[in-house]
Amino acid sequence: MVLKQRANYLGFLIVFFTAFLVEAVPIKRQSNSTVDSLPPLIPSRTSAPSSSPSTTDPEAPAMSRNGPLPSDVETKYGMALNATSYPDSVVQAMSIDGGIRAATSQEINELTYYTTLSANSYCRTVIPGATWDCIHCDATEDLKIIKTWSTLIYDTNAMVARGDSEKTIYIVFRGSSSIRNWIADLTFVPVSYPPVSGTKVHKGFLDSYGEVQNELVATVLDQFKQYPSYKVAVTGHSLGGATALLCALDLYQREEGLSSSNLFLYTQGQPRVGDPAFANYVVSTGIPYRRTVNERDIVPHLPPAAFGFLHAGEEYWITDNSPETVQVCTSDLETSDCSNSIVPFTSVLDHLSYFGINTGLCT
């Protein structure tokens, strides 16, 4: 059954990547997603740094070094959909050598927990059902689900939960598991990021977050007002990781009480969200940002860096088909190391499992 689900999901993903050239029709946000009732932006937290990243295409060295893909490998934007073999340079890159530190067991346990939260969000019993009734739910059943969202246009799914033993307010965004989600994914159209002048982000991701922004921010800030000593952690897989990033920034920009000391961001298999100026702004906030990539997962390499997009956040790269083998690229902006070292030999299948947990399927 699981193999059948994986095959169906793989087929759908291939259709999705084939459809990338189709431009989505602009869709108006729902009336309850306006920003009218949101707290005002804090001017001192919405200024882009004057400096620019020194590297804007960190994938270029590996694209040149690893050579062209075999002619029989299906590709999109120069990346393999499912390369099954790769040159020695890629094998070497996936070893733990090379001066990049290994993640500690404590870090791996932490990342696994947030991956479990993200994976559980794919279960309808959790979102919108608001009950911990799923295969991995025993790991999160002590959390109280405050509210869930499942919107009509982009099918944005999210929840706010509270862990009293951990003293943490959790915000979890589901990734793509429906055609409507892929509509949000399939355009690479950059648009101005309204809070920060001079920066641009992926239009679909911005619109997806906009569908839940108003109510979600109000819910989180209400919880934070009741529990001001709690930290706030935002997480999501795939598209959910992209919206998680926008959410974390939104909270930082509107709530003085949230800062780098109590606001945290964890993503898994997250696509690139914005341009280099946006990535530089993300770094300037100081928000601890742990971005996990599984082996040769293609999604973190989209939209391509060559298209003017760049990741922020420390990269935690799962290698050698082992959840216990995780490299950490400690740079706040992505570099040519870690997962960028293996392009263009990427894979859709590696998007479906993180730390041995099925992501994208409620299994």
UniProtKB/Swiss-Prot annotation:
Pfam family, one: Lipase_3
Region (Disordered): 33-69
Signal sequence residues: 1-24
GO molecular function: metal ion binding; triacylglycerol lipase activity
Disulphide bonds in the chain: 123-362, 134-137, 329-338
Positions annotated as propeptide: 25-94
Listed GO biological process terms: lipid catabolic process
Active site location: 238, 297, 351
Residues that coordinate or bind Ca(2+): 350
EC identifiers of the protein: 3.1.1.3
Biased composition (Low complexity): 43-62
Organism: Rhizomucor miehei
Keyword annotations from UniProtKB, A to Z: Calcium, Disulfide bond, Hydrolase, Lipid degradation, Lipid metabolism, Metal-binding, Signal, Zymogen
The name this protein goes by in its record: Lipase
Catalytic function, reaction form: a triacylglycerol + H2O = a diacylglycerol + a fatty acid + H(+)
Entry's family note: Belongs to the AB hydrolase superfamily. Lipase family.
